[in-house]
């Protein structure tokens, strides 16, 4: 859970910016995007196979 404590003299905009930065760093946006639609087991296997292939080519 991401939390931002707003200081007494702190602007809401700066606190919002800090919150967005923490959410992006924690990977919450990517997780929400990944779980937005149902992924069939076949699609999941295909996505993981592509990721493995990509990793193999990066190592070389």
UniProtKB/Swiss-Prot annotation:
GO terms for molecular function: structural constituent of ribosome. InterPro entries: Ribosomal_bS21, Ribosomal_bS21_CS, Ribosomal_bS21_sf. GO terms for cellular component: ribonucleoprotein complex; ribosome. The lineage of its organism: Bacteria, Bacillati, Cyanobacteriota, Cyanophyceae, Oscillatoriophycideae. It comes from the Bacteria. Keywords: Ribonucleoprotein, Ribosomal protein. The gene is rpsU. Residues 44-60 have a biased composition (Basic residues). This is Small ribosomal subunit protein bS21. One of its GO terms (biological process) is translation. Belongs to the bacterial ribosomal protein bS21 family. Residues 39-60 are annotated as: Disordered.
């Amino acid at each position: 859970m991401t939390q931002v404590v707003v200081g007494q003299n702190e602007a809401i905009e700066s606190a919002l910016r800090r919150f967005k930065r923490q959410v992006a760093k924690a990977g919450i946006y990517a997780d929400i995007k990944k779980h937005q639609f149902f992924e069939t087991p076949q699609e999941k296997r295909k996505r993981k196979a592509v990721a493995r292939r990509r990793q193999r080519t990066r190592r070389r």
